[in-house]
Amino acid sequence: MAISKEEVLEYIGSLSVLELAELVKMFEEKFGVSATPTVVAGAAVAGGAAAESEEKTEFNVILADSGAEKIKVIKVVREITGLGLKEAKDATEKTPHVLKEGVNKEEAETIKKKLEEVGAKVEVK
């Protein structure tokens, strides 16, 4: 039985950010492509300042290390991401791991503070 394009889109739409990031990695590995956008040299010169300001408005929160108190970190990861217990545990064990993508600076700093309070090491990029 063939799967329709609509069913694929429906399934992808139901994935969490974490699951979607893993799916993108799988596509990159299987097809030998990169999901990073390419920049045309002429456009980079003309819009370089605009691109820099856009990049600074959205941040990714990366769990670099879960530290010694993993249970507390798992609880905070679940609170932040809405993941289930197993998914949150997997996220804390497979570091570095992107927890949130495209968040504003204030939210990224709040998430970082919560995780660091329970002993995790966090990067905001």
Swiss-Prot record:
Alphabetical keyword list: Ribonucleoprotein, Ribosomal protein
GO MF annotations, alphabetized: mRNA binding; structural constituent of ribosome
Pfam families reported in the protein's UniProt record: Ribosomal_L12 (PF00542), Ribosomal_L12_N (PF16320)
InterPro entries per the UniProt record, alphabetical: Ribosomal_bL12, Ribosomal_bL12_C, Ribosomal_bL12_C/ClpS-like, Ribosomal_bL12_oligo, Ribosomal_bL12_oligo_N_sf
A single GO BP: translation
Gene Ontology CC terms: cytosolic large ribosomal subunit
Protein family according to the UniProt entry: Belongs to the bacterial ribosomal protein bL12 family.
Function: Forms part of the ribosomal stalk which helps the ribosome interact with GTP-bound translation factors. Is thus essential for accurate translation.
Subunit: Homodimer. Part of the ribosomal stalk of the 50S ribosomal subunit. Forms a multimeric L10(L12)X complex, where L10 forms an elongated spine to which 2 to 4 L12 dimers bind in a sequential fashion. Binds GTP-bound translation factors.
Protein name stated in the entry: Large ribosomal subunit protein bL12
